[in-house]
Amino acid sequence: MQHYGTRGVHGQTVEVLAQRILTGQFAEGATLDITALQSELDVSLTALREAMRVLAAKGLVDARPKRGTFVRPRDDWSLLDPDVLRWQFSRATRPGLFSDLHELRSIVEPGAAGLAAERATGSDVEALDVALAAMASAGDDIGAAVDADLAFHRALLAATHNELLQRMEVLIETGLAERDRMVHGAGPGDPVPSHRAVVDAIRRHDSADAARAMGRLLEQAVEDVARLADENR
């Protein structure tokens, strides 16, 4: 998915305003001075209004007669929107966000791995093997390592042949990408063995072992984040 920041002046305006809202620079309930923002950001009124429409669609702002455009409460935000998720994770705007991600993954992915072991076709296993090979060859290339990890988890969800589980990739991948960039940049251990254990269990159609292997993989992910947090203290 193309980020708004790569979509020209309109997209860059969306990014700037979203980050100010998510970081609290524009507080909940605050009325936005459109004229001042147009001057500060040096954009056309049309581009600014288009950006506001995007943010309104994502629940971040609203416009009312006599009140103007204002920041909506966090409870109104479309927190599962891919862009809103990315903005949150990229700026770590809320403590505990990665913990929430781990809890979600712990609920979804072991079950998904078990289901994949029951339903995976030969092409599903091949896609997992391709992701493993990419992971093994990524080396110190953080971008390649992140892409390979995302491809693995995407292939895992696809192997469940459950459309609703497959849609979870938007939620899981957005946070996983940011976590991977943070952890891989700090030089973690080899991720291939833990991922291969999941694939091998799926290849054997061993549902229980696949779920256990995914659980162990997630435990290692938590340990990696905790280790990095300790190192940065």
Predicted regions and their residues:
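Conserved donor sugar-nucleotide recognition element shared by glycan-biosynthetic enzymes
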Residues: 6-10, 149, 191
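C-terminal all-alpha effector/ligand-binding and dimerization domain
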Residues: 132, 136, 167-233
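Short loop-to-helix capping motifs
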Residues: 34, 160-163, 205-206
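Short linear motifs at protein or domain termini
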Residues: 1-107, 114, 231-233
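All-alpha effector-binding/dimerization core of bacterial HTH-type transcriptional repressors
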Residues: 75-155, 193-213
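Amphipathic alpha-helical protein-protein interaction surfaces
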Residues: 121-124, 161-165
